[in-house]
């Protein structure tokens, strides 16, 4: 019987599927190995235990979010780009809840792979905000504000805190409109 070959990328894709399907509590070396059809010991050639898997998944998920956002705003500018960014951010969080949660692992220091992945997300926000007139530190401050507002909405939505009869889509449109109208143009 031939041994099944695995690599870090396939492991992280399986780990992402596990957390997107059942949350962080479902993530284990055994669960990922089972999904890949290998013995758990095979994973240790690529990761440093469960802590390494969690950290590598955070980098993978943060990179995925950055790519998702960049794809949404390419060839857009101004408030159109701001709206596309907000919609894509919410969509990623809704379609990939486990990966979105994994992006919240704080980067330990600048220059490491997780810090660099977080910087890529900030760069997308800063580029979009440059198209509406923000530069330098001001762009970073406004990026934090916009991201915080969107993160707050999607976090409340994820825990089921928006249960009234008032339509969530309309609320999100209000949020986007408020953010867009508050920005320089």
What are these regions (language model features)?
Residues 10, 14, 18-52, 56:
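Helix-turn-helix
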Residues 19, 53-61, 103, 107, ...:
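Alpha-helical DNA-contacting segments of helix-turn-helix folds
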Residues 148-165, 180-185:
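Amphipathic C-terminal alpha-helical segment
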Residues 70-99, 110, 119, 136, ...:
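Hydrophobic alpha-helical connector segments
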Residues 7-16, 57-61, 65, 69:
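Generic hydrophobic, amphipathic alpha-helix propensity
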Residues 108-144, 166-181:
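Amphipathic alpha-helical packing segments from all-alpha helical-bundle domains
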């Amino acid at each position: 019987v031939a041994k099944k070959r695995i690599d870090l990328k396939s492991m992280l894709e399986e780990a992402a599927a596990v957390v997107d399907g059942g949350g962080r509590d479902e993530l284990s070396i055994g669960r990922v190995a089972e999904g890949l059809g290998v013995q758990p010991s095979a994973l240790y050639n690529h990761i440093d235990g469960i802590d390494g898997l969690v950290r590598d998944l955070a980098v993978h998920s943060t990179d995925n979010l950055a790519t998702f956002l960049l794809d949404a705003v390419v060839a857009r500018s101004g408030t159109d780009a701001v709206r596309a960014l907000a919609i894509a951010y919410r969509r990623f969080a809704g379609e990939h809840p486990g990966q979105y949660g994994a992006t919240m692992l704080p980067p330990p220091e600048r220059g490491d792979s997780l810090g660099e992945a977080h910087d890529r997300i900030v760069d997308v926000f800063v580029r979009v905000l440059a198209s509406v007139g923000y530069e330098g530190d001001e762009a970073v401050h406004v990026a934090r504000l916009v991201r915080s507002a969107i993160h707050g909405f999607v976090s409340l939505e994820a825990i089921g805190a928006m249960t009234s009869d008032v339509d969530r889509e309309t609320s999100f449109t209000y949020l986007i409109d408020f953010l867009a109208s508050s920005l320089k143009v």
